[in-house]
């Protein structure tokens, strides 16, 4: 098992199929939430060396994303105190008229409002991108199977991405996660944040490659709020080439 801390309130735990098998679990066990699944999650948390801010943090939510050869579990802690007070419960209305499902939906919404909303939004963005990838892959397979739908299109050779960071420390931490080849990278300073551009070579890659890479990038960054053209004209240029490589050399305290 591997664990990464995505933000102050979100962890990503990668569990291999072998790990699942050793614990008597299968992918189908995660299709319908049940007590067995919850016990598995907490047993995994007990085994890992959790960051201090996750220990005894109260309420946790788990989001499961099955992969071909593993299971990705995103764990988000709530900023709500471990003991929910009566004022919190009063916000839910008449609980006697709620089904258990409605109650937990209301509770989850309350957690989102009082917890790390940005982390939830980022996870949803990643999930939407991956859903688009699956749909595009199925569409391509369908077109390949039906010659009448084939048509010539000009493939992209390179794709530029723009990412935002609140602090330079976040940009350095992001750079250290890059373990794949990139063609170029730049760093700009905006009025209230830092912006990084990433250029990827997508030649000889499948059509969904660009979306998959974008999903990987925003695991540790925020989607860009400016275009590269805007930054070139209005941004303060800090590193015009090799920004990722230069930031990787910086040691974080």
From Swiss-Prot:
GO molecular function annotations of the record: protein-macromolecule adaptor activity
Pfam family for this entry, one: MecA
Taxonomy, superkingdom: Bacteria
Written domain comment of the UniProt record: The N-terminal domain probably binds unfolded/aggregated proteins; the C-terminal domain interacts with ClpC.
Family stated for the protein in its record: Belongs to the MecA family.
PANTHER family xref list: ADAPTER PROTEIN MECA (PTHR39161), ADAPTER PROTEIN MECA 1 (PTHR39161:SF1)
Protein name: Adapter protein MecA
């Amino acid at each position: 098992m591997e664990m990464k801390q995505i933000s102050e309130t979100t962890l990503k735990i990668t569990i291999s199929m072998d790990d699942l098998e050793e614990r008597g679990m299968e992918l189908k066990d995660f299709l319908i939430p049940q007590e067995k699944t919850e016990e598995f999650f907490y047993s995994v948390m007990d085994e890992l060396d959790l960051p201090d801010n996750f220990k005894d943090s109260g309420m946790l939510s788990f989001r499961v994303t099955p992969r071909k050869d593993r299971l990705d579990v995103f764990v988000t802690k709530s900023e709500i105190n471990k003991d929910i007070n009566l004022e919190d419960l009063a916000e839910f209305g008449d609980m006697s008229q709620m089904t258990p499902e409605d109650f937990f939906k209301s509770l989850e919404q309350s957690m989102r409002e009082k917890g790390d909303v940005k982390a939830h939004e980022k996870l949803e963005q990643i999930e939407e991108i991956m859903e688009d990838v699956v749909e595009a892959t199925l569409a391509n397979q369908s077109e390949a199977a039906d010659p009448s739908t084939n048509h010539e299109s000009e493939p992209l050779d390179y794709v530029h991405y723009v990412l935002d960071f609140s602090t330079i420390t976040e940009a350095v931490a992001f750079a250290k996660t890059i373990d794949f080849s990139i063609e170029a990278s730049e760093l700009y300073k905006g009025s209230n944040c830092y912006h990084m551009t990433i250029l990827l070579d997508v030649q000889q890659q499948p059509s969904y490659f660009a979306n998959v890479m974008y999903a990987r990038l925003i695991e540790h960054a925020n989607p860009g709020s400016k275009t590269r053209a805007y930054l070139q004209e209005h941004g303060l240029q800090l590193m015009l080439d090799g920004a990722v490589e230069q930031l990787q050399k910086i040691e974080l305290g």
